[in-house]
Structures are given as C-alpha cells and as structure tokens.
Amino acid sequence: MAQIHPTAIVDPAAELADSVVVGAYAVIGPQVRIGAGTTIGPHCVIEGRTTIGVDNRFFQFSSIGALPQDMSHDGEITELVIGDRNTVREFCTFNTGTRKEDGVTRVGSDNWIMAYVHLAHDVRLGSHCVLANNATLAGHVHVGDWATIGGLSGVHQFVHIGAHAMIGFQGHVSQDVPPYMTVDGNPLTVRAVNLTGLRRRGFSNERIGVIRQMHKLLYRDSLTLEQAVEAVGALRGQQAEAQSDADIAVMLDFIAGAKRGLVR
C-alpha cells in the first residue's frame, strides 16, 4: 500500500504502486499513474494525464503535468510520460504536450534535473541528462541522451540538442547543438569536443579521435557546411572500431535533420 501523508490529497482514481511515498500537502490528480519506489515530496502537484515510472524522486513544490503554456491549446487531452530513476529537484515545472506533435511531453530515465527547471509542452528529454538550476526548455525542444545543460540556460522552441552535447552556463540556445560538442558564450559558439563527458562514458581514444576530426572539419577548417558534411561522410569505413562509424552516422543524421540551423 502506498504511504500517503494525512495532509496529502490523492484522487481515488489515481493509480499509485504499493511502495510510492507521497509527502505532506502534495496533490495527486485522477489521471495520474505512479510506479513503484517513487517519492513525491511535500507540496508537489502531479496532475493531468501523467504517467511516472519507477524509483523517481520529486522534491518539494514541483508542478508536474499542468496544461501547456500554449495559447492555441483549447483543452484537448494531452500527456506527460516520465521514465525511471529520475531526480527532480525543487520548483520544477513539466507541462503536458499539444496536438502540434503527438500530444506527449516525454522524459527519459536516469536524468538529474535541478531546481526551477522548466520543460514546456512537447519537449523530448532523453536519458542520463543533467539540467542545472533554472534551465528552461521551450516547446518542442528535443534533447539527446547524456546531454548537459548549464544553469540559467534558455533553449528556444524547436531546437534540437545532440547526444553528449554540453551547454555552458547561461547559454542562449537558438540553433541546433551538434552531438558531442561543448557550446558556450553569447552569442553561442562551439568551443570544443566534450572530452570530459565522453571519457567519463567510456569512449575509447579512437572514438574520441574521430569525433575530434569531425569537430575540426566542421569548425576549424573554414569549410562550408556542405563541404564539411561531405568530408565527415568520407571518414566512414576507415576506422578500426565499428562504433566510430556509428558516431559518424549520429553526427550526419543530426545535421541532416537540423531545422533551425547549426550552432557554428
């Protein structure tokens, strides 16, 4: 049986696994489903059609599953889906989706989300990401796995952030950020490969070397984007590690799908 504080308000229709803990003065709505081992801190509000996986931790005063901040939203039923083992710190706000995409805001698993982070409608946040205090993701932003977004950063609607990318403190992100890169400054520019992050995740020296080659072609060799993409593509099939070809494919696929232009 779920452990619910006497002052919490949990709608009888909500579905809570037996080991869920709900803190003082929390409010849980009727369309909420919460998986085993998840802790809901004091004064949290979980509402809307929200599905939460197992072993998540929500700290006090978070607002999860509220209606999207989108003036075109006219009451259609949309959703928020959150994976497993996420940490969500104080005063975070996650909104449900809109019908402009598939109606679902999605959060992966194993994310570390610090205080005052905002995830707007239709955001797709991958897994193993770190979002520092006050990071703000506007509507339709997509973030790849293992990305890091610095504190007080603002990400413009529809921006895509690649896997393993790192955005520095107070980043003003209005264009797509390629995978594996560190970006910083105002205006935002690519500074280098995210070497520290890649090494922590076990990337071999060869894989890192290939990623550095891609960085050089894209950002240091004074090539047009079309020329750089062709040169990056020419790296395929020349590597001893098959995974390096996969890393090249990740970069090429990201560039091909970029709709707001690349940070360069």
From Swiss-Prot:
Involved in the biosynthesis of lipid A, a phosphorylated glycolipid that anchors the lipopolysaccharide to the outer membrane of the cell. PANTHER family: ACYL-[ACYL-CARRIER-PROTEIN]--UDP-N-ACETYLGLUCOSAMINE O-ACYLTRANSFERASE, ACYL-[ACYL-CARRIER-PROTEIN]--UDP-N-ACETYLGLUCOSAMINE O-ACYLTRANSFERASE, MITOCHONDRIAL-RELATED. It is an enzyme of class 2 (transferase). It comes from the Bacteria. Keywords: Acyltransferase, Cytoplasm, Lipid A biosynthesis, Lipid biosynthesis, Lipid metabolism, Repeat, Transferase. Homotrimer. One of its GO terms (molecular function) is acyl-[acyl-carrier-protein]-UDP-N-acetylglucosamine O-acyltransferase activity. The lineage of its organism: Bacteria, Pseudomonadati, Pseudomonadota, Betaproteobacteria, Burkholderiales. Pathway: Glycolipid biosynthesis; lipid IV(A) biosynthesis; lipid IV(A) from (3R)-3-hydroxytetradecanoyl-[acyl-carrier-protein] and UDP-N-acetyl-alpha-D-glucosamine: step 1/6. Belongs to the transferase hexapeptide repeat family. LpxA subfamily. One of its GO terms (cellular component) is cytoplasm. It catalyses: a (3R)-hydroxyacyl-[ACP] + UDP-N-acetyl-alpha-D-glucosamine = a UDP-3-O-[(3R)-3-hydroxyacyl]-N-acetyl-alpha-D-glucosamine + holo-[ACP]. GO terms for biological process: lipid A biosynthetic process. It comes from Leptothrix cholodnii (strain ATCC 51168 / LMG 8142 / SP-6). It is found in: Cytoplasm. Its EC number is 2.3.1.129. This is Acyl-[acyl-carrier-protein]--UDP-N-acetylglucosamine O-acyltransferase.
